[in-house]
């Protein structure tokens, strides 16, 4: 396909080449341009591959983080069930009576609120 294009370029030139030196110079320029284009395409493919690899690694890291956070959520839900149960069994026997609700403080065991 490229050779056919090259033949067309040579066949439709406005004036015939003046000498072999001119042909050689044109061929050299064409080859140089092709080599630069080949190198640029190779670099582009390399960058594309590196970006895909980087995105794959980032995706795997996010999957692991997501899994860890889902585990933390599950653990916190279990803790909530347990504490709700403890509170419901304690309230009927509590001798202090109802008190004013205090400001909700972060849970001490939660890693989010530790400094």
Curated annotation (Swiss-Prot):
InterPro entries referenced in this protein's UniProt entry, alphabetically: AP-1 (IPR000837), bZIP (IPR004827), bZIP_sf (IPR046347)
Gene name for this UniProt entry: batf
A GO BP annotation: DNA damage response
Record region (Leucine-zipper): 55-83
Taxonomic placement: Eukaryota, Metazoa, Chordata, Craniata, Vertebrata
Disordered: annotated span: 1-60
UniProt cross-references to PROSITE patterns, sorted A to Z: BZIP (PS50217), BZIP_BASIC (PS00036)
Swiss-Prot/TrEMBL keywords: Activator, Cytoplasm, Differentiation, DNA-binding, Nucleus, Repressor, Transcription, Transcription regulation
GO molecular function, one term: DNA-binding transcription factor activity
Residue ranges, compositional bias (Low complexity): 13-22
Biased composition (Basic and acidic residues): 47-60
GO cellular component, one term: nucleus
Record family assignment: Belongs to the bZIP family.
Record's subcellular location: Nucleus; Cytoplasm
Task performed by this protein: AP-1 family transcription factor that controls the differentiation of lineage-specific cells in the immune system: specifically mediates the differentiation of T-helper 17 cells (Th17), follicular T-helper cells (TfH), CD8(+) dendritic cells and class-switch recombination (CSR) in B-cells.
One Pfam family from the record: bZIP_1
Name of this protein: Basic leucine zipper transcriptional factor ATF-like
């Amino acid at each position: 396909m490229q050779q056919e294009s090259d033949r067309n370029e040579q066949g439709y030139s406005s004036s015939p080449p003046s000498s072999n030196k001119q042909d050689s110079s044109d061929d050299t320029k064409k080859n140089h341009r092709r080599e630069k284009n080949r190198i640029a395409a190779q670099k582009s493919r390399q960058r594309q591959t590196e970006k895909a690899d980087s995105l794959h690694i980032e995706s795997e890291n996010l999957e692991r983080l997501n899994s860890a956070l889902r585990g933390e959520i599950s653990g916190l839900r279990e803790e909530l069930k347990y504490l709700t149960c403890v509170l419901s069994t304690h309230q009927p026997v509590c001798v202090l009576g109802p008190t004013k609700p205090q400001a909700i403080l972060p849970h001490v065991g939660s890693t989010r609120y530790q400094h």
